[in-house]
Amino acid sequence: MSSQTVARIPVVDFSKADCLKPGTSSWLSARKDVCRALEELGCFMAILPSKVPPELHKTIFNAFDELFNFPVDTPDNPLRAGYVTSCSGQNTFGIINGTNPQETQEFTHLFWPNGNDQFRETADLYAKVMAEIDEAVTRMVFENYGVEKYHDDHFRSTFYYLRLIKYEVPKKLGVDVGLRSHTDKTFSSILHQNHVTGLEINTKTNEWVVFDPLPSSVIFMAGDVFQVWSNDRVRPCRHRVTLKENEVRYSFGLFSLHKGVIHVPDELLDKDHPLRYKPFNHLEFLRAQKDLSETEYAAKAYCAI
């Protein structure tokens, strides 16, 4: 009788109090799981019960209901600056430097001139938690590859783009594509969503695995720039969104960008891992995307040797 292994998205438990403290046994255990997941699939689900409690989850997505009901889609509306809509039914607000409380406050004031402390404080807290996870995960990877001495400089050059995303109820369940198959042009991406499924992850064997979220979880995904930095050790996470439920799908995402030049550390080069990428400026890379084929892994098309 033959058996078939069903691919699953790896889960890393960050519930222990010292799991984000470098050098502890919990840290070292999580580091092993994180690196294995990023090398094999390019992503993992992080469980964060103490940092993302159910009441926080409920608060942020209740606020989304109000936020996305504001009439922003008019040509003369100043709110359009951070608003994107698409024919696939995806609507997005974006905040540059989204971990800066001042930026969140200014964004909040555009919609609620008299203030909305609950939304602002909850969005700030989510951004803070996600940035903390991003710093910890990248530090784990740097440590694992023996280049931890570069991590502080790397993190100082990191800034974040915060996105608030709504997928409308699909016209045809299981057929409508909310987001086509792609890899992110980031160093890393972290998403937290409501209960409505739709995010699917592509495996090395070209299977599509559905991400089944928990209220206390986020999904960490490696982007193209992480792949370049690691000289192909880390797999960029190819993913898509297929709308299969008769409900609105909300997602809250933090995307890490790098100010300056990305290059492969010398320590990651050996006879089995020759240099595969030229140094490149991340922001220039983003500006060049309109000239690259959407079917390619963008980093390989842009700076592969």
Residue ranges and their predicted role:
Residues 1-305:
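Peripheral, non-catalytic segments flanking oxidoreductase cores
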